[in-house]
Amino acid sequence: MAGHSKWANIKRHKWAQDAKRSKIFTKHIREITVAARLGGPDPEMNARLRLALDRAFAVNLPKDRADAAIKKGAGLEEAEAYEEIRYEGYGPGGSAIMVDCMTDNRNRTVSEVRHAFSKHGGKMGTDNSVAYLFQERGVLVFAPGTDSDQVLEVALEAGADDLVENDDGSLEVLTTPEAYRGVRDALTEAGLEPEQADVTQRPDLTVQIEGDNAVSTARLIERLEDLDDVQHVYTNADLPAEAYEEG
């Protein structure tokens, strides 16, 4: 199966995350706390907590801070009560955008998200206005030049659904959320280490956005990601790499 270029956007995203490490740590700690509260403190028995820890350690969150977040979530220490909310909307040029938040103040969060959409030429939608365009999938991305035959063989044997070969030569292994952990472990054990791996909301189809709309969409995504209450931003926009460098 063929797909669009992902590599430049992934590298850009990793650079942006590194540049905001302190805020990123706070968001990961919040995710760990909520996961432990909802499913218990044992990552072997709590898939959401295990994924939250994977994400946190991928950006080098210290283990002692992760352990403290688990204790808070499990009720062993006092913790804030966060509510999970999803907002949906449209970017400039008509791309779909979903914004997952954790907040202790719903009014503040919706105001900030709405302002970001409005400022950058987008608009808020209603519940389920764009969610149907995405599926929750495990996605493991490999750099251009990775042996696609080997990745395909190991991934399918471990329970993956598909291998996407992107225009730039990068590879995406797709799994169900349930199969994600086993597929990732099998690939790693075979010496195939993904550059990026996560359970995410993957669009069924992407929308190519160009020119000024692409720059505005990139600014919108970056602004949403920078909001304190926002945990994840998903879009079906296929943006050129230079969109993140302009504006």
Curated annotation (Swiss-Prot):
Q: Which InterPro entries match?
A: Integrase-like_N (IPR017856), TACO1_YebC-like_2nd/3rd_dom (IPR048300), TACO1_YebC_N (IPR049083), Transcrip_reg_TACO1-like (IPR002876), Transcrip_reg_TACO1-like_dom3 (IPR026564), YebC-like (IPR029072)
The family this protein is said to belong to = Belongs to the TACO1 family.
Keyword list (alphabetical) reads: Cytoplasm, DNA-binding, Transcription, Transcription regulation
GO biological process terms, semicolon-separated: regulation of DNA-templated transcription
Major location (coarse): cytoplasm
Question: What PANTHER family would the database entry show?
Answer: TRANSCRIPTIONAL REGULATORY PROTEIN YEBC-RELATED (PTHR12532:SF6), TRANSLATIONAL ACTIVATOR OF CYTOCHROME C OXIDASE 1 (PTHR12532)
Question: A Gene Ontology molecular-function term?
Answer: DNA binding
| Locations listed in the record | Cytoplasm
Single GO cellular component annotation? cytosol
The protein, known as: Probable transcriptional regulatory protein Hhal_2210
Any transmembrane segments, and where?
A: none
- Pfam families, sorted: TACO1_YebC_N, Transcrip_reg
